[in-house]
């Protein structure tokens, strides 16, 4: 089996039946930091220059180059800084808000459904999936012909800081995949495919599928990393 794990954010998605292709062991949610460490050392127990160098020396000849690409998108949830009921439209009351219980962290995929009817303060746009898609559509996909990726740099497959979008919900991010090139063919073919892909499962788990042009470029990028695919 191919053992995979990492961040708990996409854990429910990758544990959904049919999302991972044959040959994968069940995804283990251990937190993103431990996930990187486990992947790069083949140990269930981090990507700096030293980590990448160690992988390239010890494991790349056998497992192939690293691929790091976005998998799905999600809105980013930020706590509201409202201290008085008068700051909430339609509350029908005034006076200080008393916090009885505070959630220290809530995964944005689950927060998004709660916040979908609310608007951000600067643009009046809610974090609904369609608004996240509108914002992503304004960003060039990784490996766009106008800006091809450096296949020797795994960090190049992930979009960095982008200009403020003209439309859509602007506070968003991606959960990324890190793969060895020898072990990606079947999963990439399905996950980024035109049909029979994971889009329904992605949506059901409150994430946002990548645009079609992103899927095409990411598939091309991954294919070019290894002339001969592995499993």
From Swiss-Prot:
<keyword id="KW-0520">NAD</keyword>
<protein>
    <recommendedName>
        <fullName>NAD(+) ADP-ribosyltransferase</fullName>
        <ecNumber>2.4.2.30</ecNumber>
    </recommendedName>
</protein>
<dbReference type="GO" id="GO:0003677">
    <property type="term" value="F:DNA binding"/>
</dbReference>
<keyword id="KW-0328">Glycosyltransferase</keyword>
<dbReference type="GO" id="GO:0016779">
    <property type="term" value="F:nucleotidyltransferase activity"/>
</dbReference>
<keyword id="KW-0548">Nucleotidyltransferase</keyword>
<dbReference type="GO" id="GO:0003950">
    <property type="term" value="F:NAD+ poly-ADP-ribosyltransferase activity"/>
</dbReference>
<keyword id="KW-0808">Transferase</keyword>
<comment type="function">
    <text>Catalyzes auto- and hetero-ADP ribosylation and produces short oligomers by elongating the ADP-ribose chain (up to 6-mer). Binds DNA non-specifically but with high affinity. Forms very stable complexes with circular DNA wherein the circular DNA confers thermostability compared to linear DNA.</text>
</comment>
<keyword id="KW-0238">DNA-binding</keyword>
């Amino acid at each position: 089996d191919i053992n995979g794990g990492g961040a708990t954010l996409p854990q429910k998605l990758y544990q959904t039946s049919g999302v991972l292709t044959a040959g994968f062991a069940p995804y283990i949610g251990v937190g993103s930091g431990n996930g990187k460490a486990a992947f790069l050392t083949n140990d269930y127990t981090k990507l700096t220059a030293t980590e990448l160098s160690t992988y390239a020396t010890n494991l790349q000849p056998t497992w192939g180059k690293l691929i790091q690409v976005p998998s799905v998108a999600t809105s980013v949830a930020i706590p509201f800084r409202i201290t008085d009921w008068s700051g909430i439209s339609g509350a029908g009351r005034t006076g200080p808000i008393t916090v009885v219980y505070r959630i220290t962290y809530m995964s944005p995929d689950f927060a998004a459904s709660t916040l979908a009817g609310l608007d951000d303060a600067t643009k009046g746009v809610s974090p609904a999936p369609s608004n996240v898609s509108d914002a992503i559509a304004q960003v060039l996909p990784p490996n766009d012909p106008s800006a091809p990726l450096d296949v020797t740099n795994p960090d190049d497959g992930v979009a960095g800081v982008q200009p403020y979008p003209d439309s859509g919900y602007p506070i968003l991010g991606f959960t990324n995949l890190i793969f060895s090139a020898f072990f990606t063919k079947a999963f990439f073919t399905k996950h980024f495919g035109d049909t029979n892909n994971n889009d329904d499962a992605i949506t059901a788990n409150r994430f946002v599928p990548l645009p079609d042009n992103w899927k095409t470029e990411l598939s091309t990028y991954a294919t070019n990393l290894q002339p001969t695919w592995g499993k």
